[in-house]
Amino acid sequence: MPPSDSPILDDIKSAASELIDPVLDALGGNPWPRRLINACNAAYMISDRRLGSSLPLLEEAGMQKGTRPLVFVSGIHDVHAGFVCRTDDDGLLVTFRGTLPPEDMIFWRWAADWLHDAQTVPMPWTVGERDYGQVASAFGIAVSSLARDLLETLETLNAGSASAIRITGHSKGGAMACLGATLIREQYPDRRIEVCSFAAPMTADQDFIDCYDRDGLLARTDRFQNALDPVPYLPGGPDIRQWLDGEKRLDEAKKLMLVEDAIKALPEWPYRQFGRLHFLHEEDGRIQDDEDAERAAWDAVINAVVKMRFREMIDAHSGVQRYLTALSPDEGEAED
């Protein structure tokens, strides 16, 4: 859970400040990714069906002044959660909470969430009466359990007249954002829907991606991946197995750490990554989103494995200390 004094992003006060902001420049002047990571971090503060002391983060996320977020939860110990709020451009922001961190004050709630995430077997995904491919059951069950409350909340906030509906999440929340987007698209086919995930694991198979594309969602889906973060390669799929099989850099590691046996033992999951990748480089904070970004992200993780930088790989997944910092204009002011 992010601390109450989590580092937050500087306000975007004028067009002039945007011109000298390297993060905004790298994102084509789009302020929403940095707003959305604030929303993701705010979601970790959901407790007792409330958002507690998250107001500063929500203001940074672009929540409309004078409004309040509406929270929805489900599951044992409310392990699945999210919120919807109005934004300052008359849109709506849907945020799904990620997996609770070990620092969560309630041990059983944290344990229940992690055990739920271990359900990686595929399950069919249905939107309306349409077969929508297969998804990882942990995320499918989570979104299905929240669907009714989510759609009722959107109706309460008059989503049909929103300028845009933006959907986001960090980690598990990023996977849920993509699944939730399909249900929201079904309910609001004429609304502009944008999806942005941070550190999302692999979520769905190629049939899902094809349906997602036909619904016009793929072209408006972005995903951010931090250098060294291994979670976007979990729980695995055909692309990952193929990449691992061809990795000569792992030859020594395979001998030392039985990595080769682990690769052979990987289940044949059908999951694939999708959406436009924005890769956050470790050395200079550069944001890469060209055709070579996938390779650069993979190289960073494999090199970290070979060098046994496991502690740093765990830290790389943090929404506050890594993703927020990478998208902050003044990195020197954000705690690492």
Enumerate the language-model features and the residues they cover.
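Short, flexible loop/turn elements at secondary-structure junctions
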Residues: 43, 73-76, 88, 98-100, ...
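Serine-dependent carboxylesterase/thioesterase catalytic core
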Residues: 149-241
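A residue-level signal for conserved active-site and pocket-lining positions in enzyme catalytic cores
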Residues: 39, 94, 146, 195, ...
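N-terminal low-complexity, Ser/Thr- and acidic-residue-enriched intrinsically disordered segments
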Residues: 2-88, 97
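Secretory-pathway lumenal glyco-enzymes, predominantly type II signal-anchor Golgi glycosyltransferases
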Residues: 38-41, 46, 69-72, 79-83, ...
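Lipolytic serine-hydrolase domain surface
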Residues: 205-336
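A conserved cap/lid and substrate-binding interface adjacent to the catalytic center
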Residues: 64-168, 185-192, 217-218, 296
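Charge-rich, solvent-exposed alpha-helical interaction surfaces
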Residues: 8-11, 15, 19-22, 26, ...
